[in-house]
A protein has these predicted regions:
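Extracellular interaction modules
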Residues: 1
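Structural core segment of the AMP-binding/adenylate-forming
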Residues: 5-14, 93-94, 117, 121-174
């Protein structure tokens, strides 16, 4: 059997940000009894969770990224809030708008998180994809999903495959 790890929780349920959006009563042993979502129509993970933590607990560690060479990068919730806002502004400057479908092909780069949160902030739809796709895979996905923009890694041949697929489909991607 796999070990079970319990997260240390604040004794005050109101101190937990997620309680603004989720009703998740637990029994005396901490077992989830049910789950119900609140404010579904206006919920935005980037604003309502990440940015809230960036304001309320700015120095709290949000992400630890360890690169293949062992380089560690630490990002606080304030870092995530600020970087995702910069990404959102950049995407908006490119013409990406609410409802646009944007494919993210970023391998395991930490920038994926800034990008996906930035897209959430502007209401765009993020479509994560593996960097193992080739031209025909991209062509199919571009057409099937109505992709309007692609953010991809410069590693390997990914950008080349995206360019060929864009030309093959006749689509003009941002």
């Amino acid at each position: 059997a796999l070990p079970i790890f319990r997260m240390a929780q604040s004794p005050d349920p109101e101190a937990r940000i997620y309680t603004r959006f989720v009703d998740a009563p637990e029994d005396a042993n901490g077992k989830l009894q049910s789950i119900a979502f609140k404010n579904e129509q206006s919920f935005n993970f980037a604003f309502d969770i990440v940015d809230a933590l960036g304001r309320e607990k700015p120095e709290k560690l949000a992400m630890l990224h360890v690169a293949l060479d062992g380089t560690e990068r630490r990002f606080t919730f304030k870092d995530m809030k600020d970087a995702s806002s910069q990404a959102a502004n950049y995407f908006t400057s490119l013409g990406i708008r609410r409802g646009d479908r944007v494919m993210l092909v970023l391998k395991r780069h930490y920038q994926f998180w800034f990008a996906i949160l930035g897209l959430h902030k502007i209401g765009a739809i993020a479509i994560p994809a593996t960097n193992q796709l080739v031209e025909h895979d991209f062509s199919y996905r571009f057409q099937a999903a109505g992709v309007s923009a692609v953010l991809c890694t410069a590693d390997g041949d990914t950008a080349h495959h995206v360019d060929i697929a864009e030309a093959d489909t006749g689509m003009k991607l941002t």
